[in-house]
Amino acid sequence: MAQSAPLVIGATGGSGTRVLARIAKHAGYNLGANVNASEDALEFYAFHDTWINPFTRSQRSGPAMSPWQSARMIEDFYAALARHIPEPERRGTLWGWKAPRSIYLLPFLRNECPHLKFIHLLRDGRDMALSSNQNQLSKHGEAVLTLSERLFRSTAQRSMLLWKKVNLRAADFGEAQMPENYLRVRFEDLCAQPLETTTRIMNFLGATIDPAPIARSEITPPQSLGRWRECSRRVIANLERAGASALRRFAYLA
């Protein structure tokens, strides 16, 4: 029996991807056994740590990866995949992984798995910039942002720039290169319109089960939603200037 293509769930850190993993599992997807409390696939952790920065730099007109690096990256990917769900268990089943940082590697993943489905979760960049979770900025900010973008800016401003660049890059690639297999979901829509948004996700996954009980049981808006509204107008204005193009594209700004 042939191996099916994976489902991958990605986002910038702290967007709320756990709920998407729960929805996918209701739809029958095996997202692996070695996961943490947030449903992150732990077998990809070291792979992401090793390869996101060199791959991102090569995509950003930086030094190209050498043939040896490219071959090693592919080797490491398939080793992580085999640990995550062994190949025999993937045959003829619905499977995939939820690992937010996979969003940085979408072109690579699409090249290795041409028919993969990708769910891109977004959360308002103003919320993200003001979050205490800045792990992705710490790990990958230097690879994503230029020197001028990193200098003389607050952590929140750098976080907003990272949010803008990573999400725009993924959106551009998904829409252009895999339109039938790319779904973008705003976390705010999940919270405000749980049934309608869960239905969209189920349709994308080809699931025929009733989305209503899943939406009721799995979606609870966190208290941190819209936290940016508690900040000063000056702070928010600076963030909105930094992220304007993405905030507008993703309908967070008019």
Where are the predicted features?
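Glycine-rich phosphate-binding loop used to anchor ATP phosphates in small-molecule kinases
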Residues: 77-105
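PAPS/PAP-binding and catalytic site of the sulfotransferase fold
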Residues: 16-29, 109-113, 133, 184-209
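PAPS-dependent sulfotransferase catalytic core
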Residues: 1-79, 215-221
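Surface-exposed cleft-lining segments at the edges of enzyme active sites
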Residues: 91-95, 137-138, 145-160
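Short His-Asn-centered micro-motif
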Residues: 9-12, 97-100, 187
